[in-house]
Amino acid sequence: MDQAIYTLHEFMLHTKNWTYILMGVTLLVYVGYWLFLTGRDEKIRKY
């Protein structure tokens, strides 16, 4: 962060932006992990 935050409004916008970025990254990681876990299942053999 190379510029100063002078008002509460600027601070709130900055933290809100980072919150949305982190939420998006967390969602992508969660979906990737879920696909990794469910992709390892073997097919059920029907005799």
Curated annotation (Swiss-Prot):
Keywords, ordered alphabetically: Cell membrane, Membrane, Transmembrane, Transmembrane helix
Keyword Membrane: yes
Annotated localization: Cell membrane
Highest rank taxon of the organism: Bacteria
Keyword Membrane: yes
GO cellular component: plasma membrane
Transmembrane parts of this sequence: 18-37
Main location class: membrane
InterPro entries found in the cross-reference section: sulf_resp_HmcD
Topological category with respect to the lipid bilayer: Single-pass membrane protein
Role, per record: HMWC (high-molecular-weight cytochrome c), ORF2, ORF3, ORF4, ORF5 and ORF6 in the HMC operon form a transmembrane protein complex that allows electron flow from the periplasmic hydrogenase to the cytoplasmic enzymes that catalyze reduction of sulfates.
Protein name stated in the entry: Protein DVU_0533
Protein source organism: Nitratidesulfovibrio vulgaris (strain ATCC 29579 / DSM 644 / CCUG 34227 / NCIMB 8303 / VKM B-1760 / Hildenborough)
